[in-house]
């Protein structure tokens, strides 16, 4: 057999001439008429030879394609998928690791699936135009929620508890807002200010805060005042609602995420009453709807009272009660009063029902914190709990209450005639001083109002403000707040919002900064100012914040004029000191002091500032 006969021939491609067998004499190859470029060679393959792409689509006989190789594993060797299902004993698979995230850090999927009931998603809020104001980015600290523990005094537990949010990374707060029958006094506004500080601290710690503060715009007192003044009831509420908002804004309180009015949620109230009646916790009588207090075990647990010892008198028009302690959720209409249609006849809502229904709508069946003044514990908050739990809601997980502002030992109240209106206070005192005065005591401590304590607050804040101004002038620009507050400040705030202890850290840092100024240590003074600004920013007291800088700017022109006049007098004093005429120098200083100016001698020369009132 010849060599050519023993070599198998390649199959010919259909439609082309067969290739000669290996070893046979090749025929003469025609010479090309030109030398093709590399690109031409790629486009001009030899006739009958498939391109590389064709080879992929038509693999050689008996040779599996690359994709087939993956499916055709060697016998007895498990596929990669099988390996995932059979890990080494004691070693978790990658999927298990995803399901077991780090402690306190929610998985990405969990965040998406665990929305707060009743609260629209971010996309829904943006489309509906109901998105609340955003907390300033300056308040967002370098901490991630779950890495720190904030502790709060829970009225229902009667002890300080570690705060554990319902949804990791989020905190939901409902604050009982104003009943707008009159303009606000400083006792009213303290509650909003205390919870503004709470909200700012949660935001600094990295939480996404939803803050709801309602407006009670229908009430017995509003109706009574409207009748006395011969005005529409709604005009009373609207006028005083604006006064409250102006007061909150004047004292630097951040706007709430939602601020619902009671009259805008009658539908939700009717639904809650219907559910309570169906569950046997409420009943209708003579057009009124009452809550049956004996139907709910645990009623009065918040205020720690005994139901059998409770004596709650009925109000006018509340007829048909099964028990005198049953409270009205809905009041039958009376001539001349506003009313709404319900399945039980026309009427208007009771005070307690309003908050239960609005909290359910905006924060869902369960939320984190319910707040208000201590005077609301009973009956208002107690009855809110009864309605919500009777409806099937878990309701608030923590109850936080602020103390009163008193005058001569009595709670500040318009009915007692001892109230001081915010609108009058801001005419006599800088609003930032009023914020300092109301916000710096612990929220559970009573504030006894006096002019003397206000002057002390003004003097204390003036020392902080003076330090900020001196270092800013030395630096030649506004020093940015530090990225984090000092650890001692954070520790105080984490412990039941210990503002007094936190402010002690602020004043200590100010003293350190003043010492650095006296030693001509600019870098240390600037570093202390950065820390002070970070701490004051959390408390809403930063003098360089836009809220207060505007008021400072208004007085700058006047300050320059006064500064020029004072400088003339100080130059005379310096001349007397140079001549060692100490009597004249002291006399000038004393005269300036009688005018309300404080003179401070420093290595850079004399400085002046306004003294306390």
UniProtKB/Swiss-Prot annotation:
Region (Disordered): 1-130
Chain positions recorded as Zn(2+) binding sites: 176, 355, 380, 384
Cofactors named for this entry: Zn(2+)
Any one Gene Ontology molecular-function term assigned to this protein's record: cysteine-tRNA ligase activity
Name this protein carries in UniProt: Cysteine--tRNA ligase
Chain segments carrying region 6 X 14 AA tandem repeats of P-[TA]-R-G-D-K-K-R-A-[RP]-R-[PL]-G-V: 36-119
Organism field: Streptomyces coelicolor (strain ATCC BAA-471 / A3(2) / M145)
Catalytic activity: tRNA(Cys) + L-cysteine + ATP = L-cysteinyl-tRNA(Cys) + AMP + diphosphate
Bound cofactor: record note: Binds 1 zinc ion per subunit.
Sequence repeat start-end pairs: 36-49, 50-63, 64-77, 78-91, 92-105, 106-119
Motif annotated as 'KMSKS' region, chain positions: 411-415
Record has Cell wall biogenesis/degradation as a keyword: no
């Amino acid at each position: 057999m010849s060599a050519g006969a023993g070599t198998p021939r390649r199959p010919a491609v259909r439609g082309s001439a067969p290739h000669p067998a290996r070893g046979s004499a090749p025929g003469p190859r025609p010479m090309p008429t030109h030398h093709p470029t590399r690109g031409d060679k790629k486009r001009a393959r030899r006739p009958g030879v498939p391109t590389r792409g064709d080879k992929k689509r038509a693999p050689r006989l008996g040779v599996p394609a690359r994709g087939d190789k993956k499916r055709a594993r060697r016998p007895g060797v498990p596929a990669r998928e099988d390996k995932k299902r059979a890990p080494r004993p004691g070693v978790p698979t990658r999927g298990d690791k995803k399901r077991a995230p780090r402690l306190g850090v929610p998985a990405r999927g969990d965040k998406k699936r665990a929305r707060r009931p009743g609260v629209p998603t971010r996309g829904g809020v943006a489309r509906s135009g109901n998105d609340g104001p955003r907390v300033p980015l300056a308040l967002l600290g370098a901490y991630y929620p779950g890495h720190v523990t904030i502790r709060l005094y829970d009225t229902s537990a009667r002890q300080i508890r570690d705060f554990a949010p319902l949804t990791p990374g989020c905190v939901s707060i409902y604050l009982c807002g104003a009943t707008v029958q009159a303009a606000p006094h400083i006792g009213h506004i303290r509650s909003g200010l205390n919870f503004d500080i709470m909200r700012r601290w949660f935001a600094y710690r990295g939480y996404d805060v939803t803050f709801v503060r309602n407006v009670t715009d229908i009430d017995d007192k509003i109706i009574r005042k409207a009748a006395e003044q011969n005005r529409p009831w709604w005009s009373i509420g609207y006028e005083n609602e604006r006064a409250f908002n102006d007061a909150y804004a004047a004292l630097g309180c951040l706007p709430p995420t939602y601020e619902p009015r009671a009259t805008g949620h009658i539908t939700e109230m009717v639904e809650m009453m219907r559910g309570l009646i169906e569950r046997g916790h409420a009943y209708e009588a003579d057009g009124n709807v009452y809550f049956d207090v004996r139907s709910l075990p645990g009623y009065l647990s918040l205020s720690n009272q005994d139901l059998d010892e409770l004596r709650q008198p009925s109000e006018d028009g509340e007829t048909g009660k099964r028990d005198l302690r049953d409270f009205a959720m809905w009041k039958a209409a009376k001539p001349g009063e506003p009313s709404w249609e319900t399945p039980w006849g026309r009427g208007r809502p009771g005070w307690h029902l309003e908050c239960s229904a609005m909290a359910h709508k905006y924060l869902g069946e369960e939320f984190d914190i319910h707040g208000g003044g201590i005077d609301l514990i009973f009956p208002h908050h107690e009855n809110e709990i009864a309605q919500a739990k009777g409806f099937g809601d878990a309701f608030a997980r923590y109850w936080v209450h602020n103390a009163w502002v008193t005058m001569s030992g009595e709670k500040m109240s318009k009915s007692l005639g001892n109230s001081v209106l915010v609108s009058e206070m801001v005419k006599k005192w800088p609003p930032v001083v009023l914020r300092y005065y109301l916000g710096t005591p612990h929220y559970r401590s009573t504030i006894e109002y006096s002019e003397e304590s206000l002057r002390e607050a003004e003097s204390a804040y003036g020392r902080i403000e003076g330090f900020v101004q001196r270092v800013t002038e030395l630096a030649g620009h506004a020093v940015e707040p530090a990225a984090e507050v000092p650890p001692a400040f954070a520790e105080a705030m984490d412990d039941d919002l210990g503002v007094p202890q936190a402010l002690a850290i602020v004043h200590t840092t100010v003293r350190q900064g003043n010492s650095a100024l006296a030693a001509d240590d600019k870098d240390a003074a600037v570093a202390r100012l950065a820390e002070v600004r970070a701490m004051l920013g959390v408390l809403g007291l930063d003098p360089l914040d836009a809220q207060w800088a505007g008021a400072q700017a208004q007085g700058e022109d006047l300050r320059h004029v006064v500064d020029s006049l004072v400088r003339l007098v100080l130059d005379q004093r310096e001349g007397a000191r140079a001549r060692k005429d100490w009597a004249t120098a002291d006399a000038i200083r004393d005269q300036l002091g009688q005018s309300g100016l404080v003179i401070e001698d420093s290595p850079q020369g004399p400085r002046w500032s306004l003294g306390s009132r």
